[in-house]
């Protein structure tokens, strides 16, 4: 009986440690509460750029047209974020690009980790949090 209880407790502890929280504030929550803040727009566009990069990567093998669509979106979102950043903070194109591409790469890595963890757990790279963010990004760019 003690062994069974030990196995159950160990399993619960293991499962709690393996479940990670979504690494971001959902874009839906962020944009709902701060629609007029240009900094939030910059961040949102940068997140959408990173998510588009992730979507392009996971689509590439099965649907190159879809991957290309997301690659174009990545560029459009990053360009929009750079333009806003440049105008808001009065920095050069090069400085805005350097600042935002560095952050975009870090965000893309978090999306990749989240998607890969989702795939391990469910067989799909897109969990409900990623789908929620994708819905917000789709709102900004209509294909």
Where are the regions that the model predicts?
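Short N-proximal segments of mature Sec-exported proteins
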Residues: 34-90
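Bacterial N-terminal signal peptides
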Residues: 6-15
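Compact alpha-helical subdomains of small soluble proteins
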Residues: 74-143
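Generic signal for short, ordered secondary-structure residues
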Residues: 27-28, 60, 116
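Positively charged n-region of N-terminal signal peptides that target proteins for export
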Residues: 1-4
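Sec/Tat signal peptide C-region and signal peptidase I cleavage site
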Residues: 16-23
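Repeat-mediated protein-protein interaction surfaces in helical alpha-solenoids
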Residues: 23-33
């Amino acid at each position: 009986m003690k062994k069974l209880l030990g196995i159950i407790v160990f399993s619960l502890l293991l499962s709690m440690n393996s479940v990670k929280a979504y690494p971001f504030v959902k874009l839906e929550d962020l944009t709902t509460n701060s629609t007029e803040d240009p900094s939030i727009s910059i961040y949102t566009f940068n997140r959408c750029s990173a998510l588009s990069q992730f979507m392009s990567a996971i689509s590439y093998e099965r649907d190159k047209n879809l991957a290309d669509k997301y690659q174009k979106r990545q560029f459009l979102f990053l360009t929009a974020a750079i333009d806003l950043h440049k105008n808001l903070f009065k920095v050069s194109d090069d400085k805005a690009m350097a600042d935002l591409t560095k952050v975009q790469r870090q965000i893309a890595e978090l999306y990749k980790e989240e998607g890969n963890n989702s795939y391990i757990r469910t067989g799909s790279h897109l969990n409900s949090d990623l789908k929620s963010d994708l819905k917000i990004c789709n709102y900004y760019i209509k294909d």
